[in-house]
Amino acid sequence: MKKNLKDIKVAVVSDPIYSLGGQEKHLLGILEAFPNADLYTAWYDREAIKEWFGDREIKTSFVQYIPFHKTLRHFFLLLLPWAYQSFNFRKYDVVISISIHFAKYLRTRSSHIPHVDVCLSPPKFFWQHADRNLTGPEKLKEGVNKGLYKFYHFFVGGPLEKIWQRWDFNAAQRVDYMIANSKTVQERIKRIYKRDADVIYPPVEVSKIKINKAKRENWFLYAGRLETYKGVDLAVKACIDTDVPLKVAGKGTCLEEIKQLVKNSNAKGKIKLLGYVSDAEKYDLMRRAKALIFPSKGEDFGIVPIEAMAAGTPVIAYREGGPTETISEKNPKTGILFGKYDYKELAKILRKFDSDDFDPINCRKQAEEFDTKIFVYKMRAYVEDVLSNY
């Protein structure tokens, strides 16, 4: 029986919400598609996310009330499967999880309630060793001792790893419908979970970003989290090598490392670390920049390049993952993809780069294919189809 979307009860379940990034924008897009949905998560940081989520009611698990759950969040990963299985969803018509970790572990406890998982990626700390954020005790929050690190590493990266992988695999099999956020993740889901997934690209607020058709300023931009896996060090090294100006917008665990890298170079003030910037400030930087540098390795999708193209700005990105699906290198040309993950390779492109080779209108048109309104339409149509056929 077909149900009107206005009448259905929807639960949206997210991984812990404690920062503002691409995953949180994706979550907001789902909430825009289903404005009356109830939002669940294991735990959240109200102050850290208030800019985007305001005073919205968020239902939480027992983890929210455990002391130090924010500062020791790596260790509380071990509790999250139970946290998500503790929720009761019997009053809902459909449950939508958005997961990169454990949100999909939930149980609807009813064969009449379909579970749709928007999978941003299978957990990389289980399945992709090289992409683990925590590679040693020095990466932990200051004050956490090596004993705690060894405890964490034993349970996640040690002899129990196969058990966690099996548990994760089984959780994925319980999901009724899977949505991947890119073809890259779709292939990963097939390889790891042996499941088919439909692709719905994440929402990007293209309509809120003004395009700049005028001449660009003579500096490059890196915008995003300052993490090794995002390649911020690669961007900085390449700009130091070519002696070109770079503005770095964002914060993360690599900040001190990047500061030291700049300090030890002959950058002569050309590398500017701006720290956290608001969306409005970020969009302004994008409109003025010569190009966005996006050297992220194994990127699942990548919202930032779409935002840059919406501003009419071309993108220089690593040829892997999401950017290969979103950036066009010909007819029309909206960016350049480099194939060797090496700062010298990136430096070669920066030396020859000319923003006049790119039409801002073409960049904008490319970005419009990923606008939030398209995502909202596709998500509503998908859930409506699920409820009609479940």
Language-model features: where?
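Aromatic "clamp/platform" in nucleotide-sugar-dependent glycosyltransferases that forms part
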Residues: 297
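Short alpha-helical donor nucleotide-sugar binding micro-motif in glycosyltransferases
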Residues: 276-277, 284-289, 379
